[in-house]
């Protein structure tokens, strides 16, 4: 889910576009599940994903790069300048209690 990277870390995501609200909704096969209101048309959901993560992580969009999964629901993003622990500390407060435990469990596996 959250793995160290020489530039910071990577985050594996399972994205559900066209949802009622933008939210962290759970985990799925080792990925953090996100719902986005934007439909998956012309890359708009990918842009919305970067914007959502930038707001969540309090980073400029330029420091978040989609490195895998441009046309897939399973995506990997590189987050430049934040460690796995820093990302975890920013993501977990926005998740439900069950999701928090899953995120903690998954991130501990990859450290």
Where are the regions that the model predicts?
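Contiguous, often N-terminal, cationic amphipathic patches that form binding interfaces
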Residues: 1-51, 58-61, 65-70, 75-111
